[in-house]
């Protein structure tokens, strides 16, 4: 099959036998129906990045008017890539680029005004496992950020700014860390309106020996350019020199692979508060996410119909 679109943007077409799709992503593919029309063919979906505990999902590709109940020639479909085949997963990510000549493609800004590095970790907080970013696990406040910021309800969330990075030099991403002292926070990143922001997603070992999981990160309110992917620890001096600034794909969800890194760039030009989080829902609710604020002063009056949570319960504002 040939991949032609990802997250609403045309890609330079490339052919694959297996397509890796992570939670929150969308793809369009073309399949050329040029095989023997008297046969049926297997379609299979499998879990990757975490050892599966369930059987693969199966379907049948049928040529009309061939009987769809006729089984394919083989009793079972061919096996796809192994669940932990990170090289194949990374190869697809590197192949996904903007379509040449696409008049809708926007080139990225040549440089960034701010760089934020987000280390994906697993921690224990009060004896419970939590997912974290830079060893800080996001706690969602009862009052929505947008309302709290617009109406200066500063007591409704932590005013301490989250860290822009971690101890790059000394943190070993391949080792199970003693992350039993993780902290929680509802603090947010405050971005200058219309600024260009680079975010480096760095994956690391979990609190299980020799274990790292793929995380699909999704940004609300924006599309971003995917500038690069790589194995191992991101080098803040060398790896930016390898960024793809020619034909990077625009997406809203991107994977950071096991023991790897992913670099994205976006323009903070949409007034409001926007979540950026792992799109594995349980990971987000367990703390793997951040919130960006940009241009809150440009947000118009908020309708009273959205009041009702936290400090806004029963609040009626003109």
Language model features by range: what are they?
Residues 135, 152, 178-181, 194, ...:
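N-linked glycosylation sites
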Residues 164-196, 208:
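N-terminal edge beta-strand
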Residues 1-8, 159, 165-173, 187-188, ...:
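Intrinsic, low-complexity N-terminal interaction/targeting segments
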Residues 1-113, 117, 121, 128-140, ...:
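Histidine- and aromatic-rich segments of cupredoxin/plastocyanin-like copper-binding domains
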Residues 11-15, 181-186, 247-250, 259:
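Active-site-adjacent structural elements in folded domains
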Residues 26-28, 113-117, 184-186, 194-198, ...:
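Intrinsic-disorder/low-complexity, polar/charged segments enriched in Ser/Thr/Lys/Arg/Asp/Glu/Gln
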């Amino acid at each position: 099959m040939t991949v032609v679109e990802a997250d609403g943007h045309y890609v330079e077409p490339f052919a694959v036998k297996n397509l890796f799709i992570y939670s929150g992503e969308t793809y369009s593919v073309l399949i050329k129906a040029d095989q023997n029309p008297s046969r049926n063919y297997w379609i299979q979906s499998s879990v990757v990045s975490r050892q599966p505990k369930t059987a693969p999902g199966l379907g049948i590709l049928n040529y009309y008017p061939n009987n769809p109940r006729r089984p394919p020639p083989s009793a079972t479909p061919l096996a796809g890539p192994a669940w932990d085949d990170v090289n194949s997963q990374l190869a697809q990510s590197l192949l996904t680029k903007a379509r040449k000549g696409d008049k809708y493609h926007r080139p990225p800004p040549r440089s960034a005004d701010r760089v934020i590095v987000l280390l994906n970790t697993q921690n224990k907080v009060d004896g419970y496992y939590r997912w974290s970013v830079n060893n800080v696990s996001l706690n969602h406040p009862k009052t929505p950020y947008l309302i709290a910021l617009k109406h200066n309800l500063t007591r409704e969330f932590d005013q301490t700014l989250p860290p822009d990075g971690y101890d790059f030099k000394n943190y070993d991403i391949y080792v199970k860390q003693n992350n039993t002292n993780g902290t929680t926070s509802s603090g947010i990143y405050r971005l200058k309106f219309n600024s260009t922001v680079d975010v480096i997603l760095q994956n690391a070992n979990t609190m299980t020996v020799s274990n790292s999981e793929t995380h699909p990160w999704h940004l609300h309110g924006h599309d971003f350019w995917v500038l690069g992917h790589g194995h191992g620890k991101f080098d803040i001096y060398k790896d930016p020199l390898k960024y793809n600034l020619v034909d990077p794909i625009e997406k809203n969800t991107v994977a950071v692979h096991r023991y790897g890194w992913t670099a994205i760039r976006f323009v903070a030009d949409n007034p409001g508060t926007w979540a950026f989080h792992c799109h594995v829902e349980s990971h987000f609710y367990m703390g793997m996410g951040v919130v960006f604020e940009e241009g809150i002063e440009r947000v118009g009056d908020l309708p009273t119909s959205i009041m009702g949570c936290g400090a806004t319960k029963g609040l009626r504002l003109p």
